[in-house]
Amino acid sequence: MRLTRIKAGNFRNFQHLDVQPAAGLNIVRGRNAQGKTNFIEAVFFALRGHSFRSLRDRELVTWGQESAFVEAELEGKDGRTRVRAELNPAGKKIVWAGEPVGKAELAVRLGTVLFTPDDLSLIKGGPRERRRFLDLELGIFVPGYLTALQLYRRALEQRNHLLRMGGGRRYSELLDLWTDEVCKYGMMLLSGRLEILKEFAPLACRLFGAWAGEELAVRYRSSVGLSNGVRTPGAGDLRETLAAVRQDEIRAGQTQAGPHLDDLAFMVNGKEGRPFASQGQQRSVVLALKLAQVFLWKRHTGEAPVVLLDDLLFEFDRERRDKVLETLQNDVQVFITTGERVLSGSRVFCVHSGNIQEES
């Protein structure tokens, strides 16, 4: 899949945006605070239906304006299509191929891989960041995963509410009911995570080794005591764990085992990346994770996603940067933001004060 045209009106500092990018490498250059990241955000918003920088859609609308839109024209193996996202005081409306859709459907249908400085939180941050990556970036490749995730969160909320109430026969019956639901959907999530990691982890480790000449290992840390797909987990595994900690849960008012507490560990040369890896190693690990997603998209859909790299590629040395670009050369459309530097073989767009023009 590739983006053939991106248009926007009153989006951030772009009052009017109309760009026809190259099918391959696109460089978006300009000084700081001119709109480079806003351009990447516009593309991402069109393809995903939400921002990667702001939780409030209203912040995306140009100051003093009431509404905004972003529209993307796309070309893929099934032909041409269009997606349009509109923001106004009444809310957000997304239309894809003439039909209203939600952002969850866009995430599954329109391949997008984003790498920004904030993604270093996959290594530096807490377990929640890594679970979010598992659920929203990798879970889309497992049939039924996102539905199971919604049902698990609902069951978990109900169970936690009961744990905080305490007491009575009716309470005990309801707690057992929601415990069954938590176990059922929780083990669906765990099975799905282990399944996709068996495919994803070798890709990321191979990419990291090719660029860095070092060893990367990915470890799944489960609160149920299962890891790395040793065997297929079942609902009974989680049920036994929850039974063992029931009194602790009642005192705490929280479910104390399940995929909502699990974590990933990234081991660089046998040592955990979060406390021991250098800044450069951490950056290389995250880039390997992101580009492994590109291969997953191609493997599962037969099409490459649109790749968005916000400023970070130029923080690598030239040899490693060339290896990354070589990896992406085959049928992958890439957008890279930078201050001034330009790569040969690319289409270059210059951003200045919310205006963007192609350089000849």
UniProtKB/Swiss-Prot annotation:
Gene Ontology process terms (BP): DNA replication; DNA synthesis involved in DNA repair; double-strand break repair; SOS response
Cell compartment(s), UniProt: Cytoplasm
Molecular function per GO: ATP binding; single-stranded DNA binding
One cellular component (GO) term of this entry: cytoplasm
Binding-site positions, ATP: 30-37
Annotated signal sequence range: none
Function comment: The RecF protein is involved in DNA metabolism; it is required for DNA replication and normal SOS inducibility. RecF binds preferentially to single-stranded, linear DNA. It also seems to bind ATP.
Name of this chain's protein: DNA replication and repair protein RecF
Organism of origin: Desulforudis audaxviator (strain MP104C)
